[in-house]
Regions:
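NAD(P)H dinucleotide-binding glycine-rich loop of Rossmann-like/cofactor-binding domains
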Residues: 76, 87, 114-207
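Adenosine-nucleotide cofactor-binding segment
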Residues: 203-209, 221-303
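N-terminal Rossmann-fold NAD(P) dinucleotide-binding loop
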Residues: 213-214
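Short N-terminal strand-loop motif that marks the start
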Residues: 1-88, 155, 159, 398-401
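Glycine-rich beta-strand-centered segment in the early N-terminal region that forms part
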Residues: 40-57, 72-126, 172-174
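Glycine-rich helix-loop-beta junction characteristic of Rossmann-like nucleotide cofactor-binding loops
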Residues: 194-199, 222, 287-288, 310-311
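C-terminal hydrophobic helical "lid"/dimerization subdomain
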Residues: 3, 9-11, 16-17, 283-284, ...
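Glycine-rich phosphate-binding loop and adjacent beta-alpha segment
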Residues: 243, 263, 299-359, 397-401
Length: 401
């Protein structure tokens, strides 16, 4: 089968770490740790497993992190290389899978938890929290936190992948492929809304208006009784979509603190500049005394994390949805913030996400579709999606055009 593969190469990984975040365009050239290959179809010869033919497969920020080398080394033991990426997938069963007949359109919960690995349920899985399974490196599969990061299962960036019944959700007949491919990221937004624990009428800040941030706004409006939702958006179309999805206020990154002050009447504090490295003056940056009740980082960058930590009221809640970067945690200590992570989804989040995908204003959210052999263009587009007015870029695995 034809597939895109991320492989281990120390020189290319070093290059990715050195330039990936600053010049991501270089990483779709010869230095990319990605290659288009012909490889055997993945097969797991265990009960409950079946092959899926991907139709559309999204390009996620975590996929781009793997390509650019910006992913934390924390995850290095939780993947197995080489692997075929792609965990945002709508596909078609090519064989029966227990109660699901061949030809059923499905979306995939990518987490490779105890049921998929053939081991006794760990405490999180017993509690229904499969997204934080303790057994993602054991069982009959190679290590891999998700489909799309495990060498044994394949991923959506290939012509076949293999999936366990516990991961499969049938797609209703009336739901288009373009909406169905958004179900996995929407399920993450459902998980986020629940982890945020937003009290009725509470003020919320969402830093970032890519797919993660926009879907967070949508889920917060649908599933909570949040009051004002302020979104930090870099680009015009992001701002328009944020309002369409339920934001009450939208601000540019350099206006974030001012926007929060305006809506919460917080007090602005600007620390003095002090001597820093090489004798240069450095400032800790402004902060607020007061602020929003709940702040959500949907980017994972240092600047975004600083924004949410410095604009949340004392005792407020900060939710980390983007893959975190290094940051000064002094505000979390000093303001007694509750800091919560949110990762993937669990419970009935996929069923809720299927309903959202059918009802929400998601037309044209998928703004770029590419065949596998045009992967360089696809990744370049995904790197620049916000600037280009695109929310989600996908591989159309059926296409050879």
């Amino acid at each position: 089968m034809l597939a895109l593969e991320i492989f281990r190469s120390i020189p290319r990984y070093a290059a990715a770490r050195a330039v990936g975040s600053r010049m991501p365009g270089l990483l779709v050239g010869p230095m990319a740790p990605v290659r288009l290959v012909t490889r055997d179809e993945p097969v797991v010869r265990r009960p409950g497993w079946a092959q899926v033919r991907p139709l559309l497969s999204g390009i996620c920020g975590s996929d781009l992190g793997a390509v650019t080398g910006s992913t934390s080394l924390y995850f290095s033991a939780l993947v197995s290389m080489p692997f075929v990426p792609g965990h945002e997938v709508v596909g078609e069963l090519v064989e029966d899978c227990e109660d699901l007949p061949r030809g059923t359109r499905v979306v995939i919960d990518p987490v490779l938890a105890c049921a998929a690995r053939g081991v006794a349920p760990c405490p999180p899985c017993q509690a229904g929290r499969t997204n934080v399974c303790n057994h993602i490196t054991v069982g009959h599969l190679a290590p891999g936190l998700q489909t799309g990061f495990c060498q044994d299962t394949g991923g959506g960036w290939g012509e076949r992948l293999t999936v366990h019944r516990s991961q499969l959700h049938a797609v209703p007949d009336g739901l288009s492929d373009e909406r169905a491919v958004l179900v996995e990221p929407l399920s993450c937004a459902v998980q986020l809304a629940r982890r945020a624990q937003v009290p009725p009428g509470a003020s919320v800040l969402v830093s970032g208006a890519g797919a993660v941030g926009l879907f967070a706004v949508l889920a917060l409006r649908e599933l909570t009784e949040a009051g004002r939702i302020t979104v930090i958006a870099k680009h015009g179309r992001q701002a328009d979509l944020a309002r369409a999805f339920g934001a009450t206020d939208v601000a540019a990154p350099d206006e974030a603190m001012r926007a929060v002050r305006r809506t919460t009447r917080a007090l602005r504090v600007v620390p003095p500049s002090l001597p820093g490295p090489a004798g240069r003056l450095a400032s800790a940056g402004e902060m607020l005394l007061g602020g929003v009740d709940v702040a959500i980082d949907a980017v994972g960058s240092t600047s975004s994390l600083e924004t949410v930590l410095r604009s949340t009221r004392a005792g407020g809640r900060v939710v980390l949805s983007g893959m975190p970067a290094p940051v000064d945690l002094s505000p979390a200590w000093f303001r007694e913030l509750e800091v919560a992570g949110t990762y993937a989804s669990s419970g009935d989040a996929f069923e809720v996400a299927l309903d959202l995908a059918a009802q929400a204003p998601l037309d044209d959210v998928v703004g770029g579709r590419y065949p596998l052999h045009r992967w360089r263009e696809a990744l370049d587009h995904a790197h620049s999606a916000g600037r280009l007015g695109t929310v989600k870029v996908c591989f159309d695995v059926r296409s050879r055009a």
